A protein has these predicted regions:
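Long, intrinsically disordered, low-complexity segments
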Residues: 109-112, 200-202, 291-343, 418, ...
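An aromatic- and glycine-enriched ligand-binding surface/loop that stacks and positions planar moieties
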Residues: 25-88, 171-173, 198, 205-207, ...
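GH16 jelly-roll
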Residues: 293, 388, 511, 524-704
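Short edge-strand/loop segments of extracellular domains
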Residues: 179-183, 273, 451-461, 671-689
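Bacterial Sec-dependent N-terminal signal peptides
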Residues: 1-34, 529
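Conserved, well-structured interaction surfaces
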Residues: 49, 53, 57-60, 84-170, ...
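Short coil/linker segments at helix-helix boundaries
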Residues: 130-145, 172-191, 246-266
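Extended glycan-interaction surfaces of carbohydrate-active proteins
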Residues: 204-211, 380-418, 696-703
Length: 704
């Protein structure tokens, strides 16, 4: 995980900020009749219903909420994202910061909290007079009155949900139970203790559950709305987290540590059992079919429907089947799946190593594609040079592809629409595992531990665990079961943090599998650091912790040709390129010099005009043009050797440059592909005066 820092640039943000302020001003000054007022919204039954839906929409699904279709498990030891440019990779290289956090839902959560509070404060204002005063429509009036009561409870659930999402990422935050006035002074709001924050969320869950129905009571149009089970499931997850080592050991605001308490585990167990005891829920008969858009399954307690596009399949199918192979499960995860007889898989077992996917827990085949998996009457082939292998464009990095959630009948090459997808937020199997974990921590040996743990295993046709395991052995069995049962449901990242085992998991090497015609063997690449257990609140600070990669500084009395190519210098690979670039200038080596002022060394590029320029002796800058200028290329591959090659996967580049301001001057800064500018070029900054003879006031600054 080497992080690179290159000491290059700071660019002014005046134009960016100016545009942002202009846009905000336009929005705030728009005419009142261009949008629906709050008063009108909450007087209308229909608009109020839509308002509640807008709060639900702030709940993220986990399918493609990171760039390039990244999933959160690709920031754990369970997977890697194939595309290095996905922002999920910031977690893996330790480069996520308070102002560059791919999982930044701080604003999203507080938006949801505010909208939910606003809904709660106003939903009783809905005008139902036309139903109330109609003697022939009293039933509809009673139904709509009940709708408003249930909707308010749903909003309370949503407010609790967003507060929990903040808690699990940032620790305790103030519980906001009303709409905060923008003009009010909130400086006296203090960070609560962990217990106070947890209790506030739990109380909101209880209040919501009291008025929520067990099922969407009206019709199927309410599917996806929160029910009593959803509120109690949220409370279960909340109290399980609150009892876990990370949260128990959280320091209070007075710098004291919370004591470890079996009572917290007992509360977590009771909360999970309350959900289990709701008789309408049952385990889906098939693990593999549960995730094929099974929104109405009796196992789903609360889920979010994803659109019917085939984007998920396009992002994740193996490459020979038209996919982009986005999320690649790791060998670490594969090795966690047991053999069918319940024993652990081992590479030291010659028979198992020879056929690593034979006689394994069936959830392995339901979760990922491996070498030899069946798909569309064909085989997935992940050997290094095979059609889905690592050496193919968009090929897997690990030897595996994601299978869970994907509709395998979709032809991603022709289909614009798929069959829909369901993102499970709470499901019954999690409640079983929550209950088993909490029971094992405060009452090891309780019979219910095996009852519910084995129920999850037996659905996958895994043998029941035998009685008599020690608390430690049972703890490991429960954790392994959570890993495979809940894979790619956004549990792993938070489980390893709350258990405080990140240094052993997130900090370990991420393993893939190299497959050749004659042998198999693991190959590792570095995964994310396990030292960080909570996220940082967004700020505008430059992070520390970068490794400095020197060599590009302008020290000494001359340009170091090992690190810099100079346009116009015949030793430079790209001397011919950019010699004129369609402009009137000629790049010349002598226009670049080293200067030292006030103790600082820097390179100076001088642009001049010579009325009668001599012909240059340099064969690559021989044109007789009156305008002379210079150009530098960092790490340009040159005749000086391979040390000039420097193409980091991730880096922070800083350039400090003083930009001249005069007619005819064009200052530019680019990032170019190592195979040439025609492959890719990013224009970081360009500054030039255009048409200055006719329009001396006209100039242009372009920043990307």
């Amino acid at each position: 995980m080497k992080k690179h820092y290159r000491n290059y640039f700071i660019i002014s943000k005046f134009l960016v900020l100016g545009l942002a302020f202009s846009s905000c001003s336009d929005f705030l000054n728009r005419e009142t009749d261009s949008y629906v007022s709050k008063e009108k919204t909450f007087s209308s039954y229909e608009l109020t219903a839509k308002n509640l839906v807008s709060v639900y929409e702030l709940i993220p699904d986990g399918f493609m909420r990171f760039s390039e279709g990244g999933m959160f498990d690709a920031a754990t030891d369970d997977a890697e994202h194939r595309i290095d440019g996905s922002n999920i990779q910031l977690f893996n290289i330790g480069s996520w910061t308070d102002n560059n956090n791919p999982d930044d839902i701080w604003n999203r959560c507080y938006t949801g909290i505010r909208l939910a509070s606003e809904f709660i404060d106003n939903v009783d204002k809905v005008n139902l007079d036309k139903y109330k005063l109609d003697p022939n429509n009293t039933t509809e009036y009673e139904n709509r009155l009940k709708d408003l009561k249930v909707w308010k409870a749903e909003a309370r659930f949503l407010r609790a949900y967003f507060h929990f999402e903040l808690l699990k990422r940032f620790g305790p935050t103030p519980y906001v139970s009303s709409v905060l006035a923008l003009e009010a002074n909130h400086s006296d709001v203090k960070r609560p203790s962990m217990d106070d924050c947890v209790n506030a969320i739990a109380n909101e869950c209880d209040a919501a559950a009291k008025d929520l129905e067990l099922t969407p009571w009206r019709d199927e149009s309410a599917l996806g709305h929160a029910t009593k089970g959803a509120a109690l499931a949220l409370k279960s997850r909340l109290l399980l987290y609150a009892a876990s080592p990370l949260y128990v050991q959280w320091q209070n605001t007075d710098e004291s540590n919370l004591p470890s308490s079996p009572a917290k585990w007992e509360k977590a167990a009771k909360a999970a059992k309350a959900v289990i005891d709701i008789t309408q829920y049952s385990l889906h008969p098939s693990y593999s079919s549960l995730f094929k858009n099974n929104f109405k399954s009796s196992e789903m307690i609360f889920a979010k429907r994803y659109n019917n596009s085939a984007d998920l399949e396009k992002r994740n199918f193996p490459v020979s089947f038209g996919g982009q192979g986005g999320t690649n499960p790791s060998q670490n995860l594969v090795d966690a799946y047991e053999m069918k007889d319940g024993s652990l898989f081992s590479w030291a077992n010659a028979q198992q190593a020879a056929e690593p996917y034979k006689d394994r827990d069936e959830r392995l085949n339901a979760t990922l594609f491996y070498n030899g998996s069946n798909l569309k009457n064909a085989k997935v082939e992940t050997a290094t040079d095979a059609k889905d292998g690592v050496n193919k464009p968009n090929g897997t990095k690990t030897g595996y592809y994601l299978r869970k959630y994907l509709n395998e009948d979709v032809n991603v090459l022709t289909a614009s629409n798929g069959l829909g997808h369901t993102w499970p937020i709470f499901r019954l199997a999690e409640m079983y595992l929550n209950y088993a974990e909490a029971l094992n921590e405060y009452n090891p040996g309780h019979a219910d531990i095996l009852t519910y743990l084995n129920a999850v295993r037996q659905r996958a046709h895994q043998p029941a665990l035998a009685a008599g395991l020690s608390q430690e052995a049972m703890r490991e069995a429960i954790r392994r079961e959570r890993r495979v049962e809940l894979a790619f449901e956004e549990h792993r990242a938070w489980d390893v943090r709350r258990w405080k085992i990140g240094s052993k998991t997130l900090g370990s090497d991420l393993q893939g599998l190299d497959i050749t015609a004659t042998q198999t063997g693991g190959s590792g690449s570095s995964s994310t650091s396990g030292s960080t257990t909570t996220e940082t609140i967004p700020a505008s600070e430059i992070p520390a912790g970068w490794y400095y990669y020197d060599g590009d500084e302008f020290n000494g009395s001359s340009i170091d040709h090992h690190y810099w190519g100079i346009l116009g210098d015949s030793r430079t690979k790209n001397a011919q390129y950019g010699q004129q670039q369609g402009m009137v200038q000629t790049y010349r080596e002598e226009q670049v010099s080293m200067v030292k002022e006030n103790g600082l060394s820097f390179a100076r590029i001088t642009a001049t005009r010579n009325g009668n320029p001599p012909k240059s002796t340099n064969k690559d800058a021989s044109k007789k043009e009156p305008w002379w200028s210079g150009g530098l290329i960092s790490r340009e591959t040159s005749k000086y050797g391979n040390e000039a090659k420097y193409y980091p996967l991730y880096s922070r580049i800083e350039i400090r440059a003083k930009i001249p301001w005069n007619y005819g001057v064009w200052m530019s800064s680019w990032l170019r592909h190592h195979l040439g500018y025609d492959v890719c070029e990013l224009d970081i900054q360009e500054f030039f005066v255009k048409e200055f003879e006719n329009y001396p006031q006209k100039y242009k600054v372009s920043q990307t």
